Amino acid sequence: EYQSAQLMAEKGVNVPMGIAAKSVAEAVAAAAKIGDDEVVIKSQILAGGRGLGTFKNGFQGGVHVIKTSQVEEYAGKMLGQTLVTKQSGPEGKPVDTLLLAKKMQLVNEMYFAIMLDRATLGPMIIACSEGGTSIEDLAASSPEKIIKVPISIGEGITDAMTLPLM
């Protein structure tokens, strides 16, 4: 997530302030640099459903909105631990990086991803206008709300491909 935000920011996309941290001390420093009373602390793993996940140490949730004074405690419970989500499988994924992000007041939350699709053996844009917290559940209950656009490796993303996303 933090790598994607960095790439988008480099291309002029407005993204919330976020700082990656690989230690508790770095997490505390990141929260101080953000400078707000509250921050969002997010486990960085290659699996979705982090907010609803459970760490093998019993700690609940891989994404939290917390007071800056709680960063040391939460980072200590998350870093170096294994997070189990619906997408990770029962073995889970180790958390070696956290993203500390500025808390935003959301007016509208959307989901957008580019993933490798097994069916088409290529990249696929996945988008939804109804947020991304439980995208898997939404896809199961209302699949018509999920927009899927296959990307040709030869052509890349064209203007025509983006029309369904508007």
Predicted feature residues:
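Active-site nucleotide/adenylate-binding loops and adjacent lid/helix of ATP-dependent enzymes
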Residues: 1-166
